[in-house]
């Protein structure tokens, strides 16, 4: 009868669907994690004059990249060289916002692969270099990462020098003292004393 035929067709295709699912359920699409970085000219063309919207939209996408379509990717699997290029691109669109340096310093710096932290350090320093008197906080974050995570004391000291020299008058006093602390930790007590003496003379 027609009903039996339709039931047979339904069961037949249901079985085919189950077989197809069983054979393909372990196949995952190769979505990648960090997308390719466009050129600034491409960005300007596709932003249709609203670069700030592009900055916010793509910033949010980079914040969540790797955690889409049911995936949860560990930071050690991310291509930090691409992230670094994305961060630099965002700064070309808006270097006043603290959104991207915050994302870099407080989230992406937590990678399990400590060697990748150098990309975060370099970006934070370059970001702060554009406006040291207002962006000195990111020198401090870069210095902390260099000293405590990347374990490069000389790099940390070089950033601490930038922090000391660029901090404005209304910045906390410790921004100038950090260099002395790092020098003392390295056993360079005379240099540390010279820094502290200079600070005292400056505020005397």
Residues covered by each model-derived region:
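Long, ordered, amphipathic alpha-helical scaffolds
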Residues: 1-15, 181-204
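N-terminal alpha-helical interaction modules that lie
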Residues: 1-93
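Residue at a conserved register position within TPR or TPR-like alpha-solenoid repeats
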Residues: 107-111, 146-147, 183
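Soluble extracytoplasmic domains of inner/organellar membrane proteins
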Residues: 143, 150-157, 180
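Boundary/linker segments of alpha-helical solenoid repeat arrays
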Residues: 98, 131-137, 165-176, 201-204
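Alpha-helical repeat scaffolds
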Residues: 81-82, 87, 116-129, 152-166, ...
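Membrane-embedded segments
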Residues: 78-138
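Structural register within alpha-helical repeat arrays
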Residues: 103-104, 142, 176-179, 183
